[in-house]
Structures are given as C-alpha cells and as structure tokens.
Amino acid sequence: MLPGYTAESKDGAHGYERLHDIILQDSDADGEDDVILFPHAEELANAAVGIDGDDGNGRVVRLGTTQHLDESDSSEDEATLNRVGDIPLEWYKDEKHIGYDIEGKKLMKAERSALERLLEATDDPNAMRTIYDALHDEKKTLSNADLQLIFNLQRNRTTNSNYDMYSGVQEDTVVFDPLNHPLARSSGPSKKAFVPALHDTKVIAKMVRRLRKEEAESKLRPATEEKEDEDQLLWDDGHVEMDTHTHFKYFNRVPKPKVPPPGTFESYRPPPEYLPSERAKQRQARLRTIDRREHFLPQSFDALRHVPFYHHTIQDRYQRCLDLAFFPRAQRTRLVVDPDKLLPELPNPKDLRPYPEKLSFHYKGHTATVRSVSVSPNGQYLATGCDDHLVRVYEVQTGRLMKRYDMGAPVQQVEFCPSKSLNILAAAVEYSLVFVVPTFAAHALVNDHTIRFLRAPGLSAGQREAAHALGAVDTLGGRAVTQTTLDADETAHEATTDLHDVEEREKRAEFLDASAKERNAGIVVKIAMHAKVKKFCFHIKGDYLCALCPKDHVKYRQTIMLQLSKRKVFCPFRKFSEVVTDCRFHPREPLFFLATTNSVRCYNLMAHRLQRRFKASGGVTTCLSIHPEGDNFLVGDTTSHTSWFDMDFSDKPYKRMRSHKGVVNALAFHPKTGAYPLFATGASDGQVHVFHGMVYDDYNKNALVVPVKILKHQRSVYAVAWHPSLAWLFTSTEDGVVTAWTE
C-alpha cells in the first residue's frame, strides 16, 4: 500500500481478482486487443515459447507495456498542497479543515454523507481501483501502470517489467569434468564433517531449553498496559533526559588513541634527504635498543615487492594492545583530597610524656659490637655482652664499670634473672650458658641463696665443702664470688670439660660446676649445649630457662628447656622441623611463645599442646616481645615491619607498622606499662623508634599506638632495654656504643 493512501475495498487478495475481471470486461467493450493485465504463470510460460490462444489470435501482454499514458508529466499535480508537515492527521479529525496550503489558507474538508459515498462506490466503474488520499481529502484512480507496480512489489519482482537483470551475464562456457574435479576424487570433506558434534548438540539443546523457559516465564508475567501516545512538541530540540550512568557513558567517553599516520621516512622509496649516511648508521648501531628513536633506518627499494619483512611487527602490535588496554575509557573527575585528612587523628606526642627523648649517658669501654644489654630487676646495674669476649656490668646512675667477666668467646646475649630473690646474670657464649653471681648487685643473703639454688642438688662431698666455703665468703662491692679456702694443689686435679669438643657437643645439654679458675673469675655454673646458643629467656620466677640453638642439625633440639633448681634438661618438641628465631614466657599464664621464621606458636605448658598459631605476614621474624599484661605481643621481621598482635582480636596482625628502613633487630615493652605505656624498636638503619602503646581493659576499645620519638645512631642498633621503674631506654650499636636515653 502506498504511504498516505487507504484502499476503499478490504477484500484482501480476492479484491485484485475482481478488479482483473472488471478490467477485462471494460477492454472487451471498448474493442481493444486481448490484453491480460495479471497473467498467471502458465500464461507467461506459453507466451515465452510462442503458443497462441484457442483462437490463434490471443496474446499475453504485461500491464503497462501497451497502455498509452495520457497523464501529464507535470510535477504540479503531484505537489503537496497540504503543508502541515509530518504530524498525525488525527489532530484534524474534529476540525472542518484538513490543514493549510503554502499561503496559509485553510484547506476545507469535502462534506459527503455516507449515502453519497455508497452511491459513488456503486456507480463508479473505477471504484475497485480508486484510493482515498487522506492528506488532501480526495480520491485518486490508479492507472494500469500503478496496478502493475503493486503487482510486482507483492511478488518481489522488479518495478519495471521490461528490465532484465540477467542481460549482462555471459553464458558459462566452462565444461564440468567430474574426473578432474577435486571433490570427485574423495578428497573433499566427508558427510561426517557436516554432522554437528555431540558437545555442539548439547549446547544447542541447552539454548533451546533456555529459550523455552524464557517464553514460558513471559507468558506468566502480567500483560503490561500499553501507554497512550503522548503529545509531541512540534519545535522540540531533540533533548533526551538521561540518567547519570547513561549520560556518563555517552558524553564522558574518551575515544581510543589512533595510530599515528606513517611519515615520509617510512616510505619504501623516501627522498634522498631522508636516507641516513654511514655516520648516522654507525651512531644508530652504537645506541642501545631502548635509546633508539626508531627501530629502523629509512631505506630505498625499487619496488614494493622488494621490501623485506618488518622485524619489529610483533613488538609494535603488542605495544598497540597495551595502549588500548591501559588507555582510560572515560573522563573522571579527579578528587583532590588533603593527605593530612587521610591520616588518623592521633593525640599530640607532647601530651603523652614522659618518654625518652634526650641522650644522657655513654657507657664506654667496648671495642666491638655490643649484641645485648640487660638491666637488673632493681634498675641499678646494666650488663652488656660484647664480641670482645667480655661481659661488663655498669652502674646506671654514674656509668661506673663495676665488673668485667672474660668469657673467652663472643657473647651473644646477657640477661639478669627477673626474680628479685635470685642474683643471677646469665650469658650465652657459643656452646654454653654461663651463670654469674655479681655479688655487688645484691645483699649477702640473696647471694648465698642464689649459690645454694644453683649448686644444691647432686653435689659430691668435696663440692658441698666448696659450696659451704663459697657461702661463708664475704661479698664485697666490686668483687666477684671467689673460693679462697681451696689451695692450688686441691684445684689442680679438677677436670674441666672442653665445650668445643665435637664428642662433647653431641651429648645432651648438661650442668657443669665451674672450675677453680672459673670460680675465681666469678663463674658459678655452666651448661654445656650441643650447638651454639643464639638466644635464651628466663621465666618470670627465674627457675625455668629456655635456650634456642637454631643451627642444630637435630631439629627438635633447637629448643631446650632448663630447670635450674633441679638441674633438669628436656626438649619439649619432639616433632618440630621449623627454624626458631626467638622465644618468650607468658608473664601471667602457663603459656610459651615460640617464634619461627614465618609464624608465632603459643603452647600451653599445662596441657602440653599447641594452643594457637599466629601468622606473621612478611619476611623472616627476628625478635619477639610480650606485653606485661600478656594479651598483646610484638614481632619484628626482616622487611622493616613491626607487627602488633592482639590475642583477643585475631590470629593476624592488628597493626603492621613500617617505620624503619632496615631489619628490625630488637624490640621491647616497658616492664611497667601501667605508668609508662611505651615500647621501642631498633633496626639496622641506626634508628630507635619509641611508641606510645596504650592497652585498654575495655574490649570495645582497640589499642592506641602513637609514634612519639625517633632516636638516631650512627650504626645499626642490636639491642634495646627499658629501665624497670623509669622511662629510660638503653641501646647498643654495632660500633660498641651503649647509651642511655632519658626523659
């Protein structure tokens, strides 16, 4: 149907047959030649082979080929008189006019009643070929050419019946030879290749089931009401309301970067001025690949087929893919945020005083690296262990050197016994643990009790006399425990155990009483170990001690428990394969913390089982410190991180602080956290960082960690220790400097 026209008859396909009969009747009455307007297929076939009709005079002529067109070719009749534009004509259904002409005058409707229209359709012989033009409110009669055009369009034919689309096609002169055809020799694909595979069949079946399911669901959905046609604005600018996502998608999109067009130097026959000279070629060859501006030098070829393969094709395509992958797809508003607002609000460090902030003392005399420092329980004396084989004890307040103990080998660690009822200074020296009683550091009764505590069980008669003699000796300030009642002849035959002998090291650790020479030096008891002692720690009561030998070839003997009062030695872990780095006893509960290279294990000493395992994220753990309350602990590692673990929070670090630039070698909590909630970390970058770490009793509050001070040294820091009752910090460095930092 032509646009803008409506047919008077709606009989469908049968209407054209009636129209065909009427036109034939009209043609007979006028005496014209036999013309078939709508020929059937048989008639067209007969006309093609030249068969005449029954009377021999019939002929088949297509509509439009013999009809003489009397219509005028002027375009004035076809001009659009109604100039209302492309609007719905329903807007004028209640008006007396149908629109306006080019001069703005109204075009009035033709008023005809239904009876008049019926009579016109009955009396008019051309009623079957008459259509109504709603735009101009008039009837138009279709010519034979128009009917033939409609007839051709309905059957998907060309609009011009005389047009032959195959007139320019030449006749195929190629003769098919089955014997020489490739497919005739069974070399083509078999029928099996056209059968879909089993997995393809399953995929298709799955898609069919999905479509059927969607169709069934769509039938169950309630039918949506069709919206009425909304009024349209005649002079709208085409603005479309969009949501934020759609507007961002279409208006903030950034086009992908285009490949730059090739330059003249990339031509296969560039001008002579673009060709490089020999000097330029040598300079290009000397440059590195990443420093070259281009990956090739211009060359001249006689023809394009002489151009070789571009060796940098794959790299260029890869770089192009990277450019497309990493190019921003849309414009985004950059958020300008003040970096200070991202930091948590912390109290002013000045409000958290006291804490160590100034250098007050230098404890001189060391000639090598000081690997360990320890403060006595009363805070009066400071012990240091140095690589020059000496253990020195200083008075904290004055810096006076009270005593030096020659151990004969580098000292790995020194530590005072935390119990105030025992006056013991222990030192780790290669394959042994050495116990010294500094008599000047405690009362005589405490010294006597300490000697009996270390030597009481399993002594022979001569050893009891020696112990009694040691107990009767007056202890003077600045002097070590000596045995003056024994003569040189009585001490000459005493056997000494060589701790460096291979056979002796293979034995279990055993307690050994000091020889006369060692007693003169102040050594009371030694414990021979099977491997080099790296670290050790005391229990809070001073009776138990744990020693670590990480380089022992027997893995379960890396951790050794010692009971000093009964001289018992036992290995608590029989099936243990990890390398240990540090250990600590819980200050209040029967728990034992053992740090390995990548975790911290918490053992219950009463139940003899592993209670918890804390994952230390990062590098290899180096040191461990337990909070005096026992619910938190610190772990240092080789990645410059200090991890704060909350046992009530999680098995993972509560805070992970990276304040240093080197390996964290030492860290320690202040023993008196109720008055001084402080902890310090020392690293190989020569800095000691002091933190305020407040732990609350309320479980709804997290621990508060605030950095308050940075204490700088010239060399790596190996040890840190707090004063037991003051906010003083003692540090030791690689160059043998031992300092005291006070508030």
Curated annotation (Swiss-Prot):
An example Gene Ontology CC term for this record: PeBoW complex
Pfam family, one: BOP1NT
Aminoacyl-tRNA synthetase among keywords: no
Subcellular location, record wording: Nucleus, Nucleolus; Nucleus, Nucleoplasm
Superkingdom of origin organism: Eukaryota
A single BP term in Gene Ontology: maturation of LSU-rRNA from tricistronic rRNA transcript (SSU-rRNA, 5.8S rRNA, LSU-rRNA)
Molecular-function annotations in GO: ribonucleoprotein complex binding
Chief location bin: nucleus
Keywords: Nucleus, Repeat, Ribosome biogenesis, rRNA processing, WD repeat
PROSITE patterns: WD_REPEATS_2, WD_REPEATS_REGION
WD repeat placement: 365-404, 575-615, 617-655, 659-701, 712-743
Task of the protein: Required for maturation of ribosomal RNAs and formation of the large ribosomal subunit.
Family in the record: Belongs to the WD repeat BOP1/ERB1 family.
Name assigned to this protein: Ribosome biogenesis protein BOP1 homolog
Species of the source: Leishmania braziliensis
Lineage: Eukaryota, Discoba, Euglenozoa, Kinetoplastea, Metakinetoplastina
